[in-house]
Amino acid sequence: MHRSITHPTLPALKAKFPNTTYHVAEFRDMITVLVPAQNLLETARFLRDDAALRYNMLCELNGVDYLHYPHATHRFGVNYGLTSIPHNIRLWLKVYLDPENETAPGTPGGEVRDEAAAEQGDPGLRLDSVTSIWPGAEWMEREIYDMFGIFFVGHPDLRRILTWNGFGNFPLRKDYPLRGVGEREKYKIITREGA
């Protein structure tokens, strides 16, 4: 039996952006709005600024690699968990991204020849930064960049946060080898006795 999804945000989005197609999903009373990548910034700004919505808190921001998911139609997803404190409502935004080149520099199987190109990443994995809307996104976007190679355009300080500069790979991608690509062999193991 199909039941319609109701949420106070959905009519507001349809009214504000009549020419944008948003897909909506519900799971355990949580609503997820699938946003086209090119519409992320204007959608996020509207959700924060509209008086009837006021999604003023970004609670969660994460990346997902769907490489081995059986029914996945896209390679990567970026999820934004939003809360409107004044109206006590919650919403998830999801943006799907697909790499243009599966062996782009900085991916396993792709040789890093040009550090600048590797830092910019695959053109298909570029997404507008939401740090101008929710400043708390700054470190979360850096982590997604570092772990998945998704480049956030307009980020004030997009650089690696968990791995070192020049690492050249993105370890949370599903095609990244579980044992790494030589990182363990490059560094001396420090034992408790030798420290």
Set out the residue ranges of the language-model regions:
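Terminal low-complexity/charged segments
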Residues: 1-195
